[in-house]
Amino acid sequence: MSWLTNLPPGLKNVFGKKDTPENLWIKCPKSGDLVYKDDLEASLFVTPAGAHLRVGPDLRFKSMFDGSEYEELELPEVVKDPLKFKDDRKYVDRLKSSRAKTGREDCMAAAIGKIGKQNAVVLVQDFAFMGGSLGMAAGEAFITAAEKALETKSALIICTASGGARMQEGALSLMQMPRTTVAITELKDASLPYIVVLTDPTTGGVAASYAMIGDIHIGEPEAMVAFAGARVIEQTIREKLPEGFQRAEFLRERGMVDMVVDRRDLPAKLGQILSMLMGGKPLPEVEPIAVADVEELEAAEAEAAPDEVVEVEAPAVDEIVEEKPAATKAKPRSKAKSKAAPKTDE
């Protein structure tokens, strides 16, 4: 018997095993350092190295709405397993495990509140729920949120995070792509803003539908936004893709994303945008270029021009004579006689 087993109760509490919560330390994917979880929660799960970790709807709602005050929308129920799908596991079993993991019925959650004192409906896709895949439940959630935005004359904001359409629902999941597009069209007809926050990752059918038809596209730093994966593209075209391909910064340089905003600055940026689009706040004034600046610019351009400029005067239209080659008349071919000449008797 070890002497540690004969310790008094007080010392046993000191030297005994303690239950430690899981994921107390989280490894930064960018630097490899371990970061204390409480520190991550205070920084909205942005590591000191700047990596934006994936977060769920609860944290999104609390950080985006004014004063963390919002009301979650009740989303309609859909048929759970319309195709009775089964691969290595039953689809219903996958749904049960994802619900137990996230505490939600599906990957999409919606809430209404104020951002920058402006009415807004916010949709959040949870990548922890079956990869945020788009299915019937997510499609109904999107349409419900769009209808709420139309009813309350609010902006619709969505934070996308998805691997694409949910294969376990087949064509029923693909049908959600045009359905969500129609809902967005109704928002635009009502002159209500539709803003997309592209988070990591936004791929597949989601990137091919409602994720890329917003009025304004905001990307989180280094978020992957693509239809197909980089490895698939490289194997198809047999070429090496450029560095940073399909990342938010790469898309920003090429005009597919309007801005890249740190998650901690996102509420203020959204409030600024909504106040301009919905609050009647005038756009920031742009100072006109002074005449002196224009003259300096013209002088700089003149210095950069070649020393000698040869001007060629174009001929008048009347003076242009189009010479046509002389037409040569082809000799007609002799026609063959259709009847043979008659024989003559000598």
Curated annotation (Swiss-Prot):
Gene3D superfamilies: 2-enoyl-CoA Hydratase, Chain A, domain 1 (3.90.226.10). GO terms for cellular component: acetate CoA-transferase complex. Its EC number is 2.1.3.15. One of its GO terms (molecular function) is carboxyl- or carbamoyltransferase activity. GO terms for biological process: fatty acid biosynthetic process; malonyl-CoA biosynthetic process. Its main location: cytoplasm. It catalyses: N(6)-carboxybiotinyl-L-lysyl-[protein] + acetyl-CoA = N(6)-biotinyl-L-lysyl-[protein] + malonyl-CoA. Keywords: ATP-binding, Cytoplasm, Fatty acid biosynthesis, Fatty acid metabolism, Lipid biosynthesis, Lipid metabolism, Nucleotide-binding, Transferase. SUPFAM superfamilies: ClpP/crotonase. Residues 300-346 are annotated as: Disordered. It holds the Pfam family Carboxyl_trans. Component of the acetyl coenzyme A carboxylase (ACC) complex. Biotin carboxylase (BC) catalyzes the carboxylation of biotin on its carrier protein (BCCP) and then the CO(2) group is transferred by the transcarboxylase to acetyl-CoA to form malonyl-CoA. Acetyl-CoA carboxylase is a heterohexamer composed of biotin carboxyl carrier protein (AccB), biotin carboxylase (AccC) and two subunits each of ACCase subunit alpha (AccA) and ACCase subunit beta (AccD). Belongs to the AccD/PCCB family. This is Acetyl-coenzyme A carboxylase carboxyl transferase subunit beta. It comes from Hirschia baltica (strain ATCC 49814 / DSM 5838 / IFAM 1418). The gene is accD.
